Amino acid sequence: MIGTPLKKSATRVMLLGSGELGKEVVLEAQRLGVEVIAVDRYADAPAMQVAHRAHVVNMLDRVELGRIVARERPHLIVPEIEAIDTPYLLELEQEGYTVIPTARAANLTMNREGIRRLAAEELGLPTAAYRFAASIESFRAAVKDIGLPCVVKPIMSSSGKGQSVVKSMEEIDGAWTYAMEGGRGASDTVIVEEFIPFDYEITLLTVRHAGGTTFCPPIGHVQIKGDYHESWQPMAMTPAALAESQRQAKAVTDALGGSGIFGVELFIKGDRVWFSEVSPRPHDTGMVTMISQNLSEFELHVRAILGLPVPEVANLAPAASHVVLASEAAEEVTFSGLDAALSVPETKLRLFGKPDTRPGRRMGVALSFGADTDEARNRAEQAAHAVKIVTL
């Protein structure tokens, strides 16, 4: 049952994090008559521009967060980013609030140590060999133990911040410093991972809902410095690799529990599959599903968290996405080149409306169909590169 927005009967959803993914969640929730409250650390975030109400708070401050939760009394609390006091979500859940998918899932996936130990040590899923280090001395020992090349990540970060590949012993101290600068929260721990020479990596969007578990067609993607740059669907895989990917995705999402969509990242080499990471929310590489599927990842997430039916998910046609990035910092920008971008065949454009820019900030995405994924990728790249961001 869903009530009437802005009335006593309203079904209220509080979104913690109001970026471009959250904006799409807001729109899909509102299409089903849900009242949405958007929260983030800065004003005029994309989801705030379309929500019924918005609050600007430091979500790492449980006092501030608790104040707005008590004021709004949401039926569902939906984390959209990692920069949240996730231990406090556990307390809110104990008080009777519903956290999506669960407070435990949000807490575990915020921390690479928590989710890696769950996947590798509790569930026995194949992963890259890894070590954790909380000092420069233990970091050097971990790199020596894992071997070169290796991948270094803060245990708490997002969008590739603080991640690097160490190829020589001379790079160790710089990698440690970079990880410390890119980490989020008070933790000074990093994970050192074996470098896996994979053929490709995928996101397997996995939906837990009242009727069971549904998998979307696999999404191929390219990351640059640990951050999503382009994605496409479907990604061609062997039947054995797809089956193993689905097995691993179901195992980890079942362990996390709750309802909603999960972005499960996996490395693939031939028929072999390694678990990498999981996000208990819509995934940035999944933006391609806004055109590629009969139901986008945002529609699927909203249906699942509201307890509504989730039918079979179908890929409509080969499609791809490519990011539009800012190159410099500015408090206000304009966009040119839209005529050229939208003249690319079978292409759409999404500009996120972020209030300011910084180098490398994602400001939009181009979405394209093609006769195959190669053509779709080329079209999306052409359109994205046609967009010019002009600082004022």
From Swiss-Prot:
Its EC number is 6.3.1.21. It is an enzyme of class 6 (ligase). N(1)-(5-phospho-beta-D-ribosyl)glycinamide binds at E20, L21, E80, D284, K354, R361, R362. One of its GO terms (molecular function) is phosphoribosylglycinamide formyltransferase 2 activity. InterPro entries: ATP-grasp, ATP-grasp_carboxylate-amine, ATP_grasp_subdomain_1, PreATP-grasp_dom_sf, PurT, PurT/PurK_preATP-grasp, PurT_C. It comes from the Bacteria. Keywords: ATP-binding, Ligase, Magnesium, Metal-binding, Nucleotide-binding, Purine biosynthesis. GO terms for cellular component: cytosol. It catalyses: N(1)-(5-phospho-beta-D-ribosyl)glycinamide + formate + ATP = N(2)-formyl-N(1)-(5-phospho-beta-D-ribosyl)glycinamide + ADP + phosphate + H(+). Mg(2+) binds at E265, E277. One of its GO terms (biological process) is 'de novo' IMP biosynthetic process. Pathway: Purine metabolism; IMP biosynthesis via de novo pathway; N(2)-formyl-N(1)-(5-phospho-D-ribosyl)glycinamide from N(1)-(5-phospho-D-ribosyl)glycinamide (formate route): step 1/1. Gene3D superfamilies: 3.40.50.20, ATP-grasp fold, A domain, ATP-grasp fold, B domain. Residues 117-306 form the ATP-grasp domain. Pfam families: ATP-grasp, PurT_C, RS_preATP-grasp-like. ATP binds at R112, K153, S158, S159, G160, K161, G162, Q163, E193, E194, F195, I196, E201. Homodimer. Involved in the de novo purine biosynthesis. Catalyzes the transfer of formate to 5-phospho-ribosyl-glycinamide (GAR), producing 5-phospho-ribosyl-N-formylglycinamide (FGAR). Formate is provided by PurU via hydrolysis of 10-formyl-tetrahydrofolate. Belongs to the PurK/PurT family. This is Formate-dependent phosphoribosylglycinamide formyltransferase.
